[in-house]
């Protein structure tokens, strides 16, 4: 690889890293190509990219980005997963894949500029996804007016029962 090719790779990786909300460094030593392809497909479904790149180029590319804390940790055979939409979905996809593959491991990551250990990435995977959190928040916000309306409906219903009872008593008398 000549200098211009390396510079192009660095620039491309740097621009993708700047746009990513999460970056996770993984170990893939000895994994067959079929498994790596399955991983890439799974990650793509979750709005993520998976790059296998030379450690030196990755270190240079991550310098000056929000994910700089992991830039110094590129050692041996590793690749980086960059997530753009939902960091939790990316962490879940990687954690699930790590459970099924003995040759794949999560090393560390970075979430919006903060370094994460492998355990923290696994903990992140246990959180509900962004759509689930939004649904819970909307459900909670919707519960207050619903309960309010139900309360007033019960009061009005009770008043109507009392009036109906009075009407039937007057009609009987």
UniProtKB/Swiss-Prot annotation:
It comes from the Bacteria. It holds the Pfam family Ribosomal_L10. One of its GO terms (cellular component) is ribonucleoprotein complex. GO terms for biological process: translation. Belongs to the universal ribosomal protein uL10 family. Part of the ribosomal stalk of the 50S ribosomal subunit. The N-terminus interacts with L11 and the large rRNA to form the base of the stalk. The C-terminus forms an elongated spine to which L12 dimers bind in a sequential fashion forming a multimeric L10(L12)X complex. This is Large ribosomal subunit protein uL10. It comes from Nitratidesulfovibrio vulgaris (strain ATCC 29579 / DSM 644 / CCUG 34227 / NCIMB 8303 / VKM B-1760 / Hildenborough). The gene is rplJ.
């Amino acid at each position: 690889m000549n200098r211009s090719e390396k510079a192009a790779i660095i620039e491309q990786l740097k621009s993708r890293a700047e746009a990513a909300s999460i970056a996770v460094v993984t170990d893939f030593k000895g994994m067959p190509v079929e498994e790596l392809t399955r991983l890439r497909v799974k990650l793509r479904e979750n709005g993520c990219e998976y790059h296998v790149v030379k450690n030196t180029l990755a270190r240079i590319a991550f310098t000056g980005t929000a994910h700089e804390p992991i830039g110094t940790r590129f050692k041996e055979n590793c690749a980086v997963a960059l997530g753009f939409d939902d960091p939790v979905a990316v962490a879940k996809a990687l954690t699930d894949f790590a459970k099924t593959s003995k040759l794949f491991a999560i090393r560390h990551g970075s979430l919006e500029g903060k370094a994460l250990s492998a355990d923290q990435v696994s903990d992140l995977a246990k959180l509900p996804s962004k759509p689930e959190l939004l649904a819970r928040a909307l459900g909670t916000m919707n519960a207050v007016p619903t309960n309010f309306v139900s309360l007033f409906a019960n009061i009005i219903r009770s008043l109507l029962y009392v009036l109906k009872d009075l009407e039937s008593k007057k009609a009987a008398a």
